[in-house]
Amino acid sequence: MATRTADKLEKKLVVVVGGTSGLGFAVAQAAVDRKANVVVASSKQASVDDALSRLQAGLASDDDVARVRGLTLDLAAANVEEQIVALYDFASKNGQQKIDHIAVTAGDSLYPKALDQVKAEDFINASQVRVIGALLLAKHAAKYLAKSAASSFTLTSGVRDVRPAANFAPVAPVSAAVKSLAKTLAHDLAPIRVNSISPGAVRTEFFTKIAGEHADAVLQGLAEQTLTKSNGVAEDIAEIYLVVMTSAYIDGADLVADGGSLIA
């Protein structure tokens, strides 16, 4: 008998890189709610500790609490590959258990900048975590992921490469690079499935950090550019990551959740 959709993540090992806040935390929480074994990673120990506290808060038994673990990982560090291997060793308990799904939601803040103010390091910094970090995560994931179409590796992109705007020259190409990377990795990691998810404007701590005191006004303006006249909600976007994890025929795809902004 086929496994029910609601049960497909039960006891599966899910690693969420960037899983301590915003969209990544929502993905981790959704996986925990589906009874998966979840490992979250972030660059700061305090963020990992806080996320673990929140994720474990609603779990009744010690066994359930033990399903949720975390480790630091700085994708911009000089020893990033060493840290990635340490994360995968930690998650898999030194190879005793294969990882079923990896979701990469990590990314440093991306700030729009006028073209005449752009410097080389703006693009380099924007790409460091989202593109280079993702590539290196994939490089080492091959050893730890279960080699099956039931397994997945999911990246996070965006929609600015499709619908660009002024001052996004150092930012928009990063989204395009992530999508291209996902499609290429789908070949390299096959039969493991690789996809990207492209959210539109989502109200998260990350967005508030970028927009600062203008966050509400910016979000309202972006909502007006959608067909739904709304902004995304992290918990709703997180469900798409779970769909990709549990649907064994989605591969090499980019899934857009933008309220219809691309066709508005």
From Swiss-Prot:
Bilayer-spanning residue ranges: 13-32
Where does the record place it? Membrane
Q: What is its main location?
A: membrane
- SUPFAM superfamilies (UniProt xref): NAD(P)-binding Rossmann-fold domains
Glycan attachment sites: N125
Q: Which InterPro entries match?
A: NAD(P)-bd_dom_sf, SDR_fam, SDR_superfamily_enzyme
The cofactors it requires, by name, are: NADP(+)
According to UniProt, the name of this protein is Short-chain dehydrogenase/reductase ucsE
Q: What is the source species?
A: Acremonium sp
The gene name on file is ucsE
